[in-house]
């Protein structure tokens, strides 16, 4: 039954790429559940996913990052899907890569029920990553997705992608990030979660960080839609994902749109994060 969901994600990708091109970064006057102004592409991508997933009987319900609550499709269905239809959509206006994220939960939403994840990257080409037993990369060519390779992270990487407002970082966090650059880590940060994490996965390792800061103590990235799906992917690829001290996949949410500080990366970098944050 998961295969039907994966195939539907593949079908949605070129249509969403199309609406990205058509929207040209145009905004509506509306805001989503967490106060972000919505692009036309956000809402059109959301509509595509909702319409296509409604055709799959095994999907019990959907929760979009663009909406406050859940949409129940089939009460007898097996899977709940949380998704961000267009992550990093503010980058559309400047023609940078953006993405779509899916978390597939069995029964009800919750880290312990997450059984598969996927994301799509819309850039010069379209790429898809699906994580279930392993993490598989697909490239869209000649009207279809072709399997490219299985992704696996090295023990230690070379990329540093530091998010959140730097002026609001804890001094110890800033000291840690600066130490990575002093060791020769390369800055690779676009402001889009999907392309930045995709870069680390493709290049074989590194660190993406979005800590709690004085302007957002609980972080900015949403657990169900962004943090948990990517935590699943990174762990399946041989890496790790924590909130500073605890595995993201051990966290519990109280609201559909809860946020969390998060760090994704190779084992070496995540252990260093843990050692820094144990002292805070």
UniProtKB/Swiss-Prot annotation:
Enzyme class: hydrolase
Domain of life: Bacteria
GO BP term, example: fructose 6-phosphate metabolic process
Reaction catalyzed: beta-D-fructose 1,6-bisphosphate + H2O = beta-D-fructose 6-phosphate + phosphate
Keyword match Hydrolase: yes
One MF annotation (Gene Ontology) recorded for this entry: magnesium ion binding
Subunit structure: Homotetramer.
Record's protein name: Fructose-1,6-bisphosphatase class 1
Organism the protein comes from: Wolinella succinogenes (strain ATCC 29543 / DSM 1740 / CCUG 13145 / JCM 31913 / LMG 7466 / NCTC 11488 / FDC 602W)
Gene symbol of the encoding locus: fbp
